[in-house]
Amino acid sequence: MNATPEKADDLIVVGKIFSVHGVRGEVKVYSFTDPIENLLDYPRWTLRHEGKVKQVELVSGRGSQKGLVVKLKGLDDRDEARLLSGYEICIPRSLLPNLAADEYYWYQLVGLKVINQDEQLFGKVDHMLETGANDVMVVKPCAGSLDDRERLLPYTEQCVLAIDLEAGVMRVEWDADF
């Protein structure tokens, strides 16, 4: 394992180590990719936790009931593996596949101002939730917001009218009373 970090603002969190598996240094990982096995397509990871940064290489991985079980190069001891519990798994943005013009990664939506059809500012996208039926945007108030309410808006074609990443704005069809 190497301690040389990637440029911090270029990294995207794609998973998290949550436990150990067995006695040979394997770790259990929750993947944020879809499908979850896509995380295994990235052979080098940057791990981050409480200001600590480590570079690691993936040796192997497989699916399990609650995520993935992975083997990292140089990690052969259960006690050493346990120290990585809680670390975020990051990769450089440049490694993410290109998307179609009307598709976005969640990280691109976070921070966008959300304005409805009546030009009312609801706030900014704070984070996204995966609910099964459709993704949900958690919109928290910001300076200039209509009110101080947190809103949960569906990330659907019916709700999201337009996204302008350069302007930092998302236009939605959503009543302020909802």
UniProtKB/Swiss-Prot annotation:
The organism's place on the tree of life at top rank: Bacteria
Domain PRC barrel: 101-178
InterPro entries: PRC_barrel-like_sf, PRC_RimM, RimM, RimM_N, RimM_N_sf, Transl_B-barrel_sf
Gene3D superfamilies assigned: PRC-barrel domain (2.30.30.240), RimM (2.40.30.60)
Compartments, as annotated in UniProt: Cytoplasm
Keyword annotations from UniProtKB, A to Z: Chaperone, Cytoplasm, Ribosome biogenesis, rRNA processing
Main localization of the protein described in the UniProt heading: cytoplasm
Primary role: An accessory protein needed during the final step in the assembly of 30S ribosomal subunit, possibly for assembly of the head region. Essential for efficient processing of 16S rRNA. May be needed both before and after RbfA during the maturation of 16S rRNA. It has affinity for free ribosomal 30S subunits but not for 70S ribosomes.
Recorded domain comment: The PRC barrel domain binds ribosomal protein uS19.
Subunit architecture: Binds ribosomal protein uS19.
Similarity field: Belongs to the RimM family.
Name of the featured protein: Ribosome maturation factor RimM
Gene this protein is translated from: rimM
